Amino acid sequence: MKLISTIAAATTAFGAPNADHTSRQLIFGGGIIPSGTKTYTAGIRTSADGDTYCGGSLISPTHVLTTSICTGYKEPKFVSVGTHYLNGTQDGEQIKVVSAQNHTSLNFSSGTYDFALLTLEKPSKFIPVKLPKADDSDIKPGMWSKAMGWGVTSYPNGSLSYELQGVSLEVWANDECSQVFNIGDTSVCAGGLPGKDACVADTGGPLIKENGLGDLDDILIGLVNWGYGCGDAGSPTVYSRVSTATEWINSVTKGQ
């Protein structure tokens, strides 16, 4: 199984799909998230008003959680927190990134502990998303989750969505997903229904559990990571399992 390069992953968002292990960078088969909701969702950019090239989640007033491809493919210079749009400064907050660090146990070859934290120049006014419990009790096989991003809405030749999109996906048990992909405990799989998926301009974006009636109850359970194809029946997307990184996250966010 070959992990395509980060540059190639971005290229395939507009060209022919890579049939191999593909970094997931789009949302399709879903719908538009209402403006002014899910405002913990962050777009990672190289300029304040430029296009979002990766997704992330505000997990403290001064930290955005994403995946390592988002710190390696391009330099993350700004995040747009609370925005509904792919680019521009018409809403949300555009905040400068002052540092980026990958998980201390990140293994590029196996894909374990694929997490990165961006530290912001100033606190965001938006409310961070809740982190899951470290005991993994917030994830149950068969539960429904939601992935979000600004990626293309059709595959393979779609264009990026100007508005934030979301799609509902069923969570798989790891032993079930292990029959399809070689994954470990730091991953979680979701999806597998035809035409509904995360795929090839929003890696690092959130997979959430909607735990109540409002966004304040949402729990961040995963980060868009990789998979084979897009929206194929029986082929889910692999997400970084956030519960396995809570100790590291807390050590960074509380130490700064």
From Swiss-Prot:
Keywords, sorted A to Z: Disulfide bond, Glycoprotein, Secreted, Signal, Virulence
Q: List the disulfide bonds.
A: 54-70, 177-189, 199-230
Glycan attachment residues as annotated in the record: 87, 102, 107, 157
The cross-references to InterPro entries, in alphabetical order and at most eight, read: Peptidase_S1 (IPR050430), Peptidase_S1_PA (IPR009003), Peptidase_S1_PA_chymotrypsin (IPR043504), Peptidase_S1A (IPR001314), Trypsin_dom (IPR001254)
List each copy of the Peptidase S1 domain by range.
27-254
Q: Where is the signal peptide?
A: 1-15
Q: Name one GO cellular component term.
A: extracellular region
Lyase found in the keyword field: no
Q: What is its main location?
A: secreted
Which GO terms of the molecular function aspect are on file? Answer: serine-type endopeptidase activity
Q: What subcellular locations does the record give?
A: Secreted
Q: Which domain of life is it from?
A: Eukaryota
How it assembles, according to the record, is:
Forms an apoplastic complex with host endoglucanases in tomato leaves during P.infestans infection.
This molecule's function is given as:
Secreted effector that suppresses host plant glucan elicitor-mediated defense responses. Targets host endoglucanases and inhibits the endoglucanase-mediated release of elicitor-active glucan oligosaccharides from P.infestans cell walls.
Q: Which family does it belong to?
A: Belongs to the peptidase S1 family.
Return the protein name. Glucanase inhibitor protein 2
Q: What organism is listed for this UniProt entry?
A: Phytophthora infestans (Potato late blight agent)
